[in-house]
Amino acid sequence: GAACLGAPLSHDFAVISLSDCMTPWELIKKRIRAMAESDMVMCIYNPSSRRRAGYLKEACDIVMEVQPPDTVCGYVRNIGRDNETAGVLTLKELADFKADMFTTVYIGNSHTKIINGKMVTPRGYKVV
């Protein structure tokens, strides 16, 4: 899914599910805060469901306590399916984005940027 956006995971990153079926929501929120404070790119799966409609917004609000609202983010819906869609947006826009269980969300770090319309987290190599 990440390749649909460009190269958002080309440095350290963390993956988390927003499903609270097996993990309490309070623990998930604690982990999201730690991830945001670590300045790692985040990959979020199970971002929303009918029962958890507000979890992605709440997760974004937690991240915005640490990172600016214009942090580069992205989403890919229906990865590998005929109706696959992907987009790049800001953290503030992501907070209001209507994700579903078929969506994977990516929140960039302080180095993530948009290059030629793609979400890119550089590894620090210099082009010579």
Briefly describe each language-model feature range:
Residues 1-41:
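Class I SAM-dependent methyltransferase SAM-binding "motif I" and its flanking Rossmann-like core
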Residues 37-128:
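A contiguous loop/helix-start segment that scaffolds small-molecule binding in enzyme catalytic cores
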